[in-house]
Amino acid sequence: MIPKEEVERPQKKTKLPSLPCETSLFLQLPDEILVNCLARLSKSSYRSLSLVCKTFRSLLHSQPLYSARYQLGTTEICCLYLCLRFVTATEPVSRWFTLSRRSGSVLVPSDHSLPYSNSTVTMGSKIYGEHMGDAFGPSSAIWIYDCFTRSWGDVPNMKMKRENASACVLDDKIYVMGGCDSGGINWFEMFDVKTQCWRPLPANPDVKVMTEDNVRKIDVVGGKIYVKTGAEFMDWIYDVKRGKWSAADEYMSLLWSNSWCVIENVMYCYSCSRYRWYDLEARMWREVKGLKYLKRYSSASNDNRNRMVELVNFGGKLAILWDRFERPGRSENKNIWCAMVALNRDFEGEIWGTVEWLNVVLTVPKSYNFLRPIAVSV
C-alpha cells in the first residue's frame, strides 16, 4: 500500500489573469474608434498599453494610428537626427546619430542605416532623401524611411538626376531645386505626395544660381520658399501660389547666414555671433533676447572660421548645435554641444529665448564634418 504522503496530488492549473471588465468592453469597439482613442493619448503611455493585450500592441505600431495622430495634431517631435562624416583610412564614412527623450541629452548611434542626402526632409514620421549613385554620383531616385512603422519605401523618380540638391516641404508637397546642370528644364520640381507625381516649376532667373552647389539651403515662410545661395550670389524668394521669383531684400541678405531655420513662419539665423530673427513687416533682423548666456559656452573656440553652428526647428523650439575644441589649445577632439531654447514673443513684439537645457552631446575627432540635422515627429 502506497503511503498517502507519496501519492502525487493533481496540481491546480494556474489561471491567467483576466482582463479588467472595462478593458474587455473597450476591445469590443471597432478598430477605427480604438485608434481614435489611442491617438489622443501621450506616447509615454504606449509602452504600458502594449503590455495589456495583442490588440493594443498591433494598433500601437500601425500606420492608421500615426495618421490619426497627425490629423488630430497630437504627434510629438521626439527625435533629432544628425548626420556626421568621419575620415577613415580608406574613404569618408557618414553616420547618423539620434537625440531623443529616451536617450536624454546624449547623442547615440542611430538604429537606422539611413543614407546621407543633402536634400533630406521630413513629413510627419517619414524621412525622404535622394539615393546617391555610384561613387556619390547624381541620382534621380528617392528613398523613404518611416520612423513610426520602421519600414522603407520608394517614390517615383525625379525628372532630373541630382547631387547635393536642396529640398523643403509645404502642404504635403516636396520642393527640390539645384544639384544638377543649369540647362535642365527640371532644375526646380515639386513632388505631390497625394498624387505621387513630379511636376516641373519655373527655373530661377539667374543662370549662375542654377549651377551646381550654388543653392545652400531652402525653407518655407508664409507660403514662400526662401532660397539662400552662395555669398557671391543674390538670394531669392519663390512665391508658390503665383509661381513667381523675386530677389530677396538686400538688408535681409546682409545678415542671412547658412545657419538658419524656420519656426512658426519666423526665420531664425546665427550671424555675426548673434542669434537673430527676421521681422517681415519691418524688413529687418532683430536679436533674439535672452541668449547672451550661451556665449560663455560657444565663444571659447580658437578656430571660429571652422566652427559649426546649426539651428533646427524641434517641435516649435529652437535647437542650437555647435562645436568647440574639447580643451583650449591643442586638442584632437571637438565637443558637439546642444541647447534647447523655448521661444516667446512679448507685448512689444520682441522674441525672447529661454534655455531649457544645454549639454555636450557627443565628442568627435576634430577632422569630422557636420552634414545634416533633421527633426522627426512620431
UniProtKB/Swiss-Prot annotation:
Q: Which Pfam families match?
A: F-box (PF00646), Kelch_FKB95 (PF25210)
Asked if Magnesium is a keyword of the record, the answer is no
Determine if Protein biosynthesis is one of this entry's keywords: no
CDD domains assigned: F-box_AtAFR-like
Cysteines paired by S-S bonds:
none
The residue spans of each Kelch repeat are: 124-172, 173-218, 220-259, 260-305
Report the superkingdom from the record.
Eukaryota
Q: The F-box domain covers which part of the protein?
A: 23-69
Entry keywords, A to Z: Kelch repeat, Repeat
Q: Which protein, by its recorded name, is this?
A: F-box/kelch-repeat protein At4g29370
Native organism is Arabidopsis thaliana (Mouse-ear cress)
Q: What is the lineage of its organism?
A: Eukaryota, Viridiplantae, Streptophyta, Embryophyta, Tracheophyta
